[in-house]
């Protein structure tokens, strides 16, 4: 029997592995679009010219009259300006199944006054019309930078801080947009300026070069429509992390932004592991958490199989990224969120009011997290040499810090769920045996669950020996008591409400005709 159950336990991970395994068929290339990328030729040496070209690329990327593929090409051109060899940068990181990059050089030609003295060319020919299209008159619908509203002199800024710092300020902001552009477009503008603040304080981004909100929204729209651009940026981060140690200041700043981009869209998955599993509390032995634990284990295997690109599966729109949504392991996620809102006050602002929230598991997570005994890790007691006296005093301090009011945190955010929590239903204090007898509670935990469970499944305790942290049977029974009492009270209130409705239904029916008549003559 044990072998049979172990087969079911590993089914989720083995199923995911078989689905993602290559079938060995022929690889048929898909259709690829051509995207133009512009790089600086050796004749462009003046810093003012370079900054002018950078702002020109940025302006074209925001031009809504252009195709999104063209706008994405201008952002690629801007990002490539950070490297001495843009061609090598694109060859290393720009290999993509969706696009083929065609590179054009921008050279200095003083005779061409209509196009600011520039010409677009390749090794074999010059492109007059492309040059006029790129450097001809262009109406900026909105300012690119907040400094333009204040008539800030970018040339003076260039003289003060130098070209690398000014270019770096622009490119870093493009990277910051990626943090929220794919996974949280609704909060893009707010998230951008929150992340930007650290770079403003350390002087990386000067105030005159801060993007306007419209610029941020425009870049975000291009990123959402051009997956090839996002793939290029992700490959840039992967290359930085795996093969280079001599990074420039700009590249180091990009890596800092990359820390925000990693695991974007995977917050629920990571928080479930952090608060639900790594805390190793006794509630993990509940049988209705077992399927979700197996699912989470298979997701961990999938995540690790992705290698260096695993943190980016959401922004890369990897086909498996939907499996990591918390709706696929709702009970374990709900329990983890209950633990989180108690252990981390910042998590109380996290949106937990979702349609798949399991309210009982959410409350259970809070209950075990507030319990003083469950906060003490027995796995470290022997290693640290904690005495019984010290452990008892620690338990006393934890009990005092918890407040002892037994209040629950309500789910936050999300209009799809409305939950009313009665704070007096369950208390975290220890009740007297006499009180339990008055409520007709039997000591047989199995009978309690059979009599008072309102769920479709019966919650049982099993596999406690699999936990690394030792658990006390009395703690488990106490948790059962608390949940069972709440379920029984809820069922009793529901029955009383149904009885009242049955009694009043006949009277309501008899008054229907009178109410209708009154409405017709304007009485109601």
Curated annotation (Swiss-Prot):
Region span, Homomultimerization: 440-461
Keyword vocabulary terms for this entry: Capsid protein, Helical capsid protein, Host cytoplasm, Ribonucleoprotein, RNA-binding, Viral nucleoprotein, Virion
InterPro entries: Paramyx_ncap
Region annotation (Ncore) ranges: 4-404
Localisation per UniProt entry: Virion; Host cytoplasm
Binding site for RNA: 180, 190, 195, 260, 350, 354
Region (Disordered): 496-524
Subunit and partners: Homomultimer; forms the nucleocapsid. Binds to the viral genomic RNA. N0 interacts with the phosphoprotein (via N-terminus); this interaction allows P to chaperon N0 to avoid N polymerization before encapsidation. Interacts as N-RNA template with the phosphoprotein (via C-terminus); this interaction positions the polymerase on the template.
Protein name in the entry: Nucleoprotein
Species assigned in the record: Human parainfluenza 1 virus (strains A1426 / 86-315 / 62m-753)
Lineage: Viruses, Riboviria, Orthornavirae, Negarnaviricota, Haploviricotina
